[in-house]
């Protein structure tokens, strides 16, 4: 009986070749070829282990390792011929290895399946991506600390409901983003622990009959632990989902920060100016200077949220173990990592270059009755119940709205219309400086607390 030879590694069982459209439809090499370095890394470790347990000879191992290293050089030189008919990154590299070193190349896959191979590749790739992203978060946090220290005394309005609430320092406001990014960092560090568990050796789903020593490949590849169950090792992608969840939270924070930057650069706020290199213009309106970087980051957050939803939906209906559905895990994961990394890089470059317009910020804080709470607290210290003080100050604010005067602009006689408990010392608390300086505790907006927080932040970053 004659058997038609195919390029597929699994072609022996089939009596006809795959339909040409189906071959293109099911191929993943166009996007999973970015895993080449990690695929080769895993294969070198696997071959090294096979030689140690006697499945390969030392000469076979050396030929495989040398061949794989030459293939990596070809790929990085741009001379490697990626073939769709070979389906994926794994079979493209294996086929090229066999071309280079002959039948020995066919021995590389002994004791291994593409199921555990790809799971290993993705974990190795994601581990490196997380490390890069963590470095970008740290760089952005360093920029925030530098700007916060420089603007520790700069007063701006703090907002609730986007309405003027209380005076804060610009430095204090920036440190809020530092804190959020710190939690993003912690989540990704924690996620990395679960990413860094090795599925290699799980084979297709049940393990292998060869006398493999998974501890060897685990050590060679820098994993923290060997996966404890072969079914789980090849089939689950919860580590990718967890990464996308952490990435979504980080992008949500960047999106909120972006919204503030867009508002602050507008003619209606004018709180800050962004250098021209982070902005673009209009093809029709000559005056425009558009904050494209924060706008685009705000928009790109949706891509990462979509990746999270896509992966959850991908996994929710799959029985154990591996299913072809899992081919769809890579593009959303790749896109989420790329988007977060690039967004962080853009912000890390941009934030230190922000130029605050201090007088405009200060004037905005002065205009909105931002020290009303300070007046209420002043009356509480005079012995009045807070609810009564709240009502008294509310009447004073209404008078200020009607007369066009801020609380600090009213005379003592005007203020005493609302309470005889108000004395001349009230003006110490109605100034913007008095307001921010009074909030002198850990986490408060007082300038000395901002500087202390910056010092704590720098100590934290130095310990990473």
Swiss-Prot record:
Pathway named in the protein's UniProt entry: Amino-acid biosynthesis; L-arginine biosynthesis; L-arginine from L-ornithine and carbamoyl phosphate: step 3/3
Pfam families for the chain: ASL_C2, Lyase_1
SUPFAM superfamilies attached to this UniProt entry: L-aspartase-like (SSF48557)
Protein localization: Cytoplasm
UniProt-listed Gene3D superfamilies: Fumarase/aspartase (C-terminal domain) (1.10.40.30), Fumarase/aspartase (Central domain) (1.20.200.10), Fumarase/aspartase (N-terminal domain) (1.10.275.10)
One BP annotation, GO: arginine biosynthetic process via ornithine
GO CC, one annotated term: cytosol
Domain of life: Bacteria
GO molecular function: argininosuccinate lyase activity
InterPro entries attached to this UniProt entry: Arg_succ_lyase_C, Argininosuccinate_lyase, Fumarase/histidase_N, Fumarate_lyase_CS, Fumarate_lyase_fam, Fumarate_lyase_N, L-Aspartase-like
Entries under HAMAP family matching the protein: Arg_succ_lyase
UniProt-recorded name of the protein: Argininosuccinate lyase
Organism: Pseudomonas aeruginosa (strain ATCC 15692 / DSM 22644 / CIP 104116 / JCM 14847 / LMG 12228 / 1C / PRS 101 / PAO1)
């Amino acid at each position: 009986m004659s058997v038609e030879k195919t390029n597929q590694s699994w072609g022996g069982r089939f009596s006809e070749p795959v339909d040409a459209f189906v071959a293109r439809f099911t191929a993943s090499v166009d996007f999973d070829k970015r895993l080449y370095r990690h695929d080769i890394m895993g294969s070198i470790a696997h071959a090294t282990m096979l030689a140690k347990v006697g499945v390969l000879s030392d000469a076979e191992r050396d030929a495989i390792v040398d061949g794989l290293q030459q293939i990596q050089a070809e790929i990085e030189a741009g001379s490697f011929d990626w073939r769709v008919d070979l389906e994926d990154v794994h079979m493209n590299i294996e086929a090229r290895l066999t071309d280079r070193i002959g039948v020995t190349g066919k021995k590389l896959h002994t004791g291994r399946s593409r199921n555990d191979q790809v799971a290993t590749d993705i974990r190795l790739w994601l581990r490196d991506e997380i490390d890069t992203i963590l470095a970008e978060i740290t760089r952005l946090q360093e920029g925030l600390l530098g700007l916060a220290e420089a603007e520790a005394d700069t007063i701006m309005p703090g907002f609730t409901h986007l309405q003027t609430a209380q005076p804060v320092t610009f430095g204090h406001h920036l440190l809020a983003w530092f804190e959020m990014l710190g939690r993003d960092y912690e989540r990704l560090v924690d996620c990395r622990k679960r990413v860094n568990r090795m599925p290699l050796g799980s084979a297709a789903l049940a393990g292998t009959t060869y006398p493999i020593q998974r501890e060897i490949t685990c050590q060679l590849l820098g994993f923290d632990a060997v996966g404890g169950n072969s079914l789980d090792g090849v089939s689950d992608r919860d580590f990718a989902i967890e990464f996308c969840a952490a990435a979504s939270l980080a992008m949500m924070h960047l999106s909120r920060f972006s919204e503030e930057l867009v508002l602050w650069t507008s003619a209606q706020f004018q709180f800050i100016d962004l250098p021209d290199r982070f902005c673009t213009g209009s093809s029709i309106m000559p005056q425009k200077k558009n904050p494209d970087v924060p706008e685009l980051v705000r928009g790109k957050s949706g891509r990462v949220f979509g990746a999270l939803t896509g992966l959850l939906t991908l996994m929710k209906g799959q029985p154990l173990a591996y299913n072809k559905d899992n081919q769809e895990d890579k593009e959303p994961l790749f896109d989420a990592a790329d988007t977060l990394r690039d967004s962080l890089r853009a912000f890390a470059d941009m934030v230190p270059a922000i130029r605050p317009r201090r007088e405009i910020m200060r004037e905005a804080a002065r205009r909105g009755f931002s020290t009303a709470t300070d007046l209420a607290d002043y009356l509480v210290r005079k012995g009045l119940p807070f609810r009564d003080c709240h009502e008294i100050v509310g009447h004073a604010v209404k008078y200020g709205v009607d007369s066009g005067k801020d609380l600090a602009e009213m005379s003592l006689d005007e203020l005493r219309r609302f309470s005889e408990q108000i004395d001349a010392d009230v003006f110490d608390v109605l100034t913007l400086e008095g307001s921010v300086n009074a909030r002198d505790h850990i986490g408060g907006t007082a300038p000395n607390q901002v500087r202390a927080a910056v010092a704590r932040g720098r100590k934290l970053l130095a310990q990473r």
